[in-house]
Amino acid sequence: MDYVNPHHFVTNCISGKWKMTILHHIHHYGKIRFNETKKTLGVSEKVLSQQLKELTHDGLIERIQYNTIPLKVEYILTPLGEDLIPALDILYIWSVRRLASLNLPIDPDAFKVHTEMKYEDQLMDIMDTYKHKQHPEADANENVSHQ
């Protein structure tokens, strides 16, 4: 019997430039449609299609096709996909903290789907620290105005 390494397994499920973003997008909006997601995320049709197929294959999302004209397809999280969201949130918080510590620019659009109250305080603290590193003159002005 060949054993499967759990780290490799989960990494395979979420590897891909857009998979974690897609999962959070679905979690935030409840469901997504292909063209809206392509436009919102700015991802190519080919890449989005492939990522959605892989996420569906791995059981993290479900593709729902409506027999309408024109054809309507939506994607929702499965219970397995929902179970993964807290772990992705932890990775996201770590990543934002790390980017801020490296003083790297953080995509503001990435915050749109990460505004749940349980993480908002952490994100705001990190962003405040990040902004102070980016604009130290704002701290000096703030200190002067409070005196």
Model-assigned labels for residue ranges:
Residues 56-76:
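Beta-hairpin "wing" of winged helix-turn-helix
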Residues 51:
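Residues within the DNA-recognition helix of helix-turn-helix
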Residues 2-47:
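N-terminal helix-turn-helix DNA-binding core of bacterial DNA-binding proteins
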Residues 9, 21, 36, 72, ...:
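Amphipathic alpha-helical recognition patches that constitute DNA-binding helices
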Residues 25, 68-70, 105:
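Conserved beta-strand edge residues that scaffold enzyme active sites
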Residues 41-43, 54, 104-106:
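Juxtamembrane/interface motifs at transmembrane-helix termini
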Residues 1-2, 57, 62, 79-147:
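C-terminal regulatory/oligomerization modules of transcriptional regulators
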